[in-house]
Swiss-Prot record:
Residues engaged in binding S-adenosyl-L-methionine: 167-168, 199, 221-223, 300
GO terms of biological process kind: rRNA base methylation; tRNA methylation
Gene name per UniProt: rlmN
Species annotation: Psychromonas ingrahamii (strain DSM 17664 / CCUG 51855 / 37)
Molecular function in Gene Ontology: 4 iron, 4 sulfur cluster binding; metal ion binding; rRNA (adenine(2503)-C2-)-methyltransferase activity; rRNA binding; tRNA (adenine(37)-C2)-methyltransferase activity; tRNA binding
Protein's UniProt keywords contain rRNA processing: yes
Protein name: Dual-specificity RNA methyltransferase RlmN
Note accompanying the cofactor annotation: Binds 1 [4Fe-4S] cluster. The cluster is coordinated with 3 cysteines and an exchangeable S-adenosyl-L-methionine.
Swiss-Prot/TrEMBL catalytic activity: adenosine(2503) in 23S rRNA + 2 reduced [2Fe-2S]-[ferredoxin] + 2 S-adenosyl-L-methionine = 2-methyladenosine(2503) in 23S rRNA + 5'-deoxyadenosine + L-methionine + 2 oxidized [2Fe-2S]-[ferredoxin] + S-adenosyl-L-homocysteine; adenosine(37) in tRNA + 2 reduced [2Fe-2S]-[ferredoxin] + 2 S-adenosyl-L-methionine = 2-methyladenosine(37) in tRNA + 5'-deoxyadenosine + L-methionine + 2 oxidized [2Fe-2S]-[ferredoxin] + S-adenosyl-L-homocysteine
SUPFAM superfamilies: Radical SAM enzymes
Record keywords: 4Fe-4S, Cytoplasm, Disulfide bond, Iron, Iron-sulfur, Metal-binding, Methyltransferase, rRNA processing, S-adenosyl-L-methionine, Transferase, tRNA processing
Classification via InterPro entries: Aldolase_TIM (IPR013785), Methyltransferase_A (IPR040072), RlmN_N (IPR048641), RNA_MTrfase_RlmN (IPR027492), rRNA_lsu_MTrfase_RlmN/Cfr (IPR004383), rSAM (IPR007197)
Length: 372
């Protein structure tokens, strides 16, 4: 009889300590093994030299360390790396963005997305399922293995993690929170809570739960300054409108030390849709009572979508209006523009190729059956 092995990447420190107690071991074994897994990227129990041989054998029999595998990799001339990683028989997208003073990893929380935002490449794929804890933290583990695990000292290969990949993170809280705990844990990736960021489209009840259970940086996908426009772009706005959303944000930042009293507002600029100077004034007035920093994101076009990227002059005019109101504003740099730019596009391309392959295979089988 085969015993299903426990994937240790599914367990935060508390869960791992309980696991070792069940094995009849001391709880401190959890910290020993975590250092091997997360500080050194180790997946072979035999290499864990400070773990006794008897326990290593026991672990080989009942546990495993399994992370998503790389299916497709794209490397940009600017150093950006985009991966399609396999999770079961599906794929999610993970992006590594190195800069002079930091290295940010953008990870996914779901296979596809249920929210159907009309500017999003991932939304075109529909929703399949939530990722497990191991599939979320495993993206960090796999990326760290590729870009260089440094152990106890040396420059960190990943300094920031953002939940801005495929999926709505707050619709997968039960798995997201333990994964983020591993990012923050000293025996995990030991990241500062200001360097772990969750982005949400506005699942207000889950935002309240998040604030009660963990403290990380918050970014919100706003993208419009009135409900009429936002509902056109984001169906979730019909359930939780802008006023409800911003009220939830204020409750979160009142609890949070990671945000230092401010939230990051993400505003996607769509050419001649939400990028006029009048709309910039409207946004500035809307946010006057919300302590925030604003991140303007020029749209990255992708096949099958009619929105266009605004000109630099339109972006500059929008930015100037906000700055005149005293806001701190950044314009997101275009990174990796020589590889698939839009979030979800790489996995979308993989899915399209897979569908074409399956179609050809089925056509071949039909021909064979007909010939028989």
């Amino acid at each position: 009889m085969n015993i299903k092995k426990v994937n240790l990447l599914d367990l935060n420190r508390e869960g791992l300590r309980a696991f070792f107690v069940e094995l009849g071991e001391k709880p401190f074994r959890a910290e020993q093994v975590m250092k091997w897994i997360y500080h050194y990227g180790c997946e072979d129990f035999d290499l864990m030299s400070n773990v006794n041989k008897k326990l290593r054998q026991k672990l080989k029999e009942c546990a495993e360390i399994v992370a998503p595998e790389i299916k497709v990799e794209q490397r940009s001339n600017d150093g950006t790396i985009k991966w399609a990683m396999t999770v079961g028989d599906q794929e999610v997208e993970t992006v590594y963005i190195p800069e002079k003073d930091r290295a940010t990893l953008c990870i996914s929380s779901q296979v596809g997305c249920v929210l159907a935002c009309n500017f999003c490449s991932t939304a075109q794929q529909g929703f399949n399922r939530n990722l497990s804890v191991s599939e979320i933290i495993g993206q960090v583990w796999r990326a760290a293995k590729i870009v260089g695990v440094t152990g106890e000292s040396g420059k960190r290969p990943i300094t920031n993690v953002v939940m801005m990949g495929m999926g709505e993170p707050l619709l997968n809280l039960n798995n997201l929170i333990p994964a983020m705990e591993l990012m923050l844990d000293d025996f995990g990736y030991a990241l500062s809570k200001r360097r772990v960021t969750v982005s949400t489209s506005g699942v207000v009840p889950a935002l309240d739960i998040l604030g009660d259970r963990i403290d990380v940086s918050l970014a919100i996908s706003l993208h419009a300054a009135n409900d009429t426009l936002r509902s056109q772009m984001m169906p979730i706005n019909d359930k939780y409108n802008i006023a409800d959303f911003l009220a939830g944000v204020k409750r979160y930042i009142a609890k949070s030390k990671a945000n230092r009293g401010k939230v990051y507002i993400e505003y996607l600029l769509l050419d001649h849709f939400n990028d006029s100077t009048d709309q910039a004034h409207e946004l500035a007035i809307l946010l006057k009572d919300t302590p925030c920093k604003i991140n303007l994101i020029p749209f990255n076009p992708f096949p099958g979508n009619d929105y266009q990227k605004p000109s630099n002059s339109r972006v500059d005019r929008f930015n100037k209006v906000l700055m005149e109101y005293g806001y701190t504003v950044t314009v997101r740099k275009t990174r990796g523009d020589d590889i698939d730019a839009a979030c979800g596009q790489l996995v979308g391309d993989v899915i399209d190729r897979t569908k074409r392959t399956m179609k050809k295979r089925l056509q071949g089988e039909n021909i064979a059956i007909s010939a028989g």
